[in-house]
Amino acid sequence: LIQEDLPFIKSENKINNKKIKFKLPSVDLLKIPTQKDKEKIRDDDYIDSEFLEKILLDFGVSGNIKKVSHGPVVTLNEFEPAAGVKVSKIINLSDDIARNTSSESARIATIPGRSTIGIELPNSSRENVYLSEIFSNNDFTKKDVRLPIALGKNISGIPVVGDLASMPHLLIAGTTGSGKSVCINTIILSLLYRHTPDKCKFILIDPKMLELSTYEGIPHLLCPVITEAKKAASVLGWVVKEMENRYRLMTKEGVRNIDSYNAKHILAMPYIVVVVDEMSDLMLVAGKEIENYIQKLSQMARAAGIHIIMATQRPSVDVITGTIKANFPTRISFQVTSKIDSRTILGEQGAEQLLGKGDMLYMSSANRIVRIHAPFVSDNEIEKVNNYLRSQAEPDYIDEILNFADEKELSGETSNSGDKDELYQAALDIIRSEGKASTSFLQRKLQIGYNRAARIID
């Protein structure tokens, strides 16, 4: 395998002159919070801790509230139950606590490493979380975080930044209006703010045709935004092929991962981030094929610098299969409709008690679940950033990706027709020799499905 033959190196040579001048976007393109936004929420917006203790006592649960943490959206009350009180008894009181405190919902969960139980109650007025605040934080600009993504603020109001390189893949679920699409936009913008087109490339798959089309034409794209589900399966096939090429190249160079390779070479191998906005649409069209590709990529692509971000609004078992779940240890759940959906995505209930509009539960690869409030980014802000990027460079699409998709479809059609002709002749021979002709007879003899046997009989 010759190094220069790899697609990412071919494209590097073409835009070599342009990449030197490339400037990363400024935080000024995003909305900066004003002093009014930063003002503290009034004290009467919170539930009094003594009142909460009294409510619990009315239900036969005695104990004390040890600590209260006021966040931008919810307040965390750390409750220490008296000896002999079961945790399950307190968790089952979530609906009663919400009713007695006149709250929209109440989430109760154990706090790892502490003897207290967290009771999360929503504030009567929500504080806005802006993307510019997270980008200005020191955690986002750290050099050792290779692919930083702005997740939002935790319950205490502290900015949370994740590293996609260590995740290494991300699964997002949530109903319509829960903030799922805004979260995908903040993740894409996070990477656009940190990496030039020669360091990080994107493949965007958007069967809904609306959410990711705004990124069309930015220089970070490897191919135009994919909107057809059949083409998406073929593009994922190309990503698998690219991963195998990278593995061969790294084996030849004697390195173990993309970072070691880039440390040895001037021509950096870019990260590839594949974003799939609606997984259920793809699973309907080509479920088994997509699942096989995603399984391959999620198991092996990390070392090759390829990462997948998948989102779905239907977190049922037929979309998020056991195979997909096993290979996506890092997951985000926004508000879902039922406890069953919450268990499917996180393995425990609680996501049905979320408030919507960016309120999420983040499960890291260590299986710790943290409540985070995702930042809001408007369409206007996204468009400003995209226009700034488009003004600096043209996208350098790799034709091989779309050609790969077209070739695969053509070869699929020819092979299907070839199979049919071959079986048709075999079916004729069997019918002549046996003197019988029926669909079920052909199914048994040729070991094929009902539909195919019926077509041959017709």
What are these regions (language model features)?
Residues L1-G162, S166-H169:
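Low-complexity, intrinsically disordered P/S/T-rich segments
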Residues L52, I294-L297, A427:
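Aromatic/hydrophobic pocket-lining residues that form π-stacking "cages" and hydrophobic walls in ligand
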Residues V129-E133, A173-G174, E383-N387:
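Short, charged, solvent-exposed linker or helix-capping segments at domain edges/interfaces
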Residues K54-D58, D95-S103, L189, Y193, ...:
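Short, intrinsically disordered, mixed-charge
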Residues L93, I187, I456:
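Residues within the DNA-recognition helix of helix-turn-helix
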Residues S364-D458:
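Conserved alpha/beta core segments of nucleic-acid transaction machinery
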Residues K18-P25, I111-E120, D139-R256, K264, ...:
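P-loop NTPase catalytic phosphate-binding loop
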